[in-house]
Amino acid sequence: MTQLETRTEPMVVNFGPHHPSMHGVLRLVVTLDGEDVVDCEPVIGYLHRGMEKIAENRTNVMFVPYVSRMDYAAGMFYEAIVVNAPEKLANIPVPKRASYIRVLMLELNRIANHLLWLGPFLADVGAQTPFFYIFREREMIYDLWEAATGQRLINNNYFRIGGVAADLPWGWLEKCRDFCDWFGPKIDEYEKLITNNPIFRRRIEGLGRIEKEDAINWSLSGPMLRASGVPWDLRKVDHYECYDDFDWQVAWEKEGDCYARYRVRIEEMRQSLKILRQACDMIPGGPTENLEAKRLNEGKGSDAAGFDFQYVAKKVAPTFKIPNGELYTRLESGKGEIGVFIQGNNDVTPWRFKIRAADSNNLQILPHILKGHKVADIMAILGSIDVIMGSVDR
């Protein structure tokens, strides 16, 4: 008896760019053999706004409000890196109190970033309840930001070359301590709901496994790298701001799958709480901004000393000039390494301003880790990467 052979042709399916699980306007062109993923091609650029060119036509103070629109979950990190680059190029020291305030804002943003990752990721794999819980905690972080900067989510416009825009208001540190005391048990609540939940573990354990060598070769960073057995955290490696003053550990796992990335982010929130508590207790007094960086140092032969500028009301704003030279600086955001390559030519605007977004690099490994998985696993693996398309496309 002859047996008929069944042949299936590969099928090409479009995911996005308007699919609710796409985490933004990301389009995936997926080739399927039945239920199995054969190939995947990410299509990006739908949210490109020319941020680097905007930076090259703005002074630093003018550009700081723009940057939090790139990654609305990590606005403080982008504000920090945008002012760190000219600071290091011009060797401008930052007062100790300002550095502590920066750390407080960055660690609050790290917790907010991980919370905004946690809710949609769990919704992607079928757990709806934690999605509503995370906004309860984020609301308290919004209140802290609003008290210090005037804005809640983005456009905080708080970081400045040489420090921060304003000191913390009276009672802010006590409110931050209250948040730390309140949020610690909430992480335990998440772990009780999620971490050892057998349905959750069977759903994502073993998915999207990335080996240690692959993570390094693909230039991954942040939880994507640390979940694959590489304890690399720029807060420990580069010793920027005042992180060396605090006692905390790098969160990392060895398995390299979606579950390991979840464990890393949960532990990072605990470590951020430790840093916040220590910063609230140890913050010194003193100025919050190096005002010398704002001084207009033009010299006698400059137009600023001429008749027109002095007597015809054409007052020159105290704009910092970026000195000649080039420099790359980086910091550890909630998603990984974000960096800026800046090239100055003794002008108020940079000649070149290149932004390295962490999730842009992390997204590139997606086709590599999707091959061989089922079509239903695409959303779980993509969700574990933590992408915001504003910073991917820039």
Swiss-Prot record:
List this protein's GO terms for biological process: photosynthesis, light reaction
This enzyme's EC code(s)? 7.1.1.-
Membrane topology for this entry?
Peripheral membrane protein
Q: Which GO terms describe its molecular function?
A: NAD binding; oxidoreductase activity, acting on NAD(P)H, quinone or similar compound as acceptor; quinone binding
Q: Which Pfam family name is an example for this entry?
A: Complex1_49kDa
Would you say which domain of life the source belongs to? Bacteria
Main localization, broad class:
membrane
Q: What keywords tag this UniProt record?
A: Membrane, NAD, NADP, Plastoquinone, Quinone, Thylakoid, Translocase, Transport
- GO CC term (a single one): plasma membrane-derived thylakoid membrane
Compartments (UniProt record) = Cellular thylakoid membrane
Q: Which reaction does it catalyse?
A: a plastoquinone + NADH + (n+1) H(+)(in) = a plastoquinol + NAD(+) + n H(+)(out); a plastoquinone + NADPH + (n+1) H(+)(in) = a plastoquinol + NADP(+) + n H(+)(out)
Subunit and partners: NDH-1 can be composed of about 15 different subunits; different subcomplexes with different compositions have been identified which probably have different functions.
* Family designation: Belongs to the complex I 49 kDa subunit family.
Function summary: NDH-1 shuttles electrons from an unknown electron donor, via FMN and iron-sulfur (Fe-S) centers, to quinones in the respiratory and/or the photosynthetic chain. The immediate electron acceptor for the enzyme in this species is believed to be plastoquinone. Couples the redox reaction to proton translocation, and thus conserves the redox energy in a proton gradient. Cyanobacterial NDH-1 also plays a role in inorganic carbon-concentration.
Protein's recorded name: NAD(P)H-quinone oxidoreductase subunit H
Q: What is the lineage of its organism?
A: Bacteria, Bacillati, Cyanobacteriota, Cyanophyceae, Synechococcales
Its gene name is ndhH
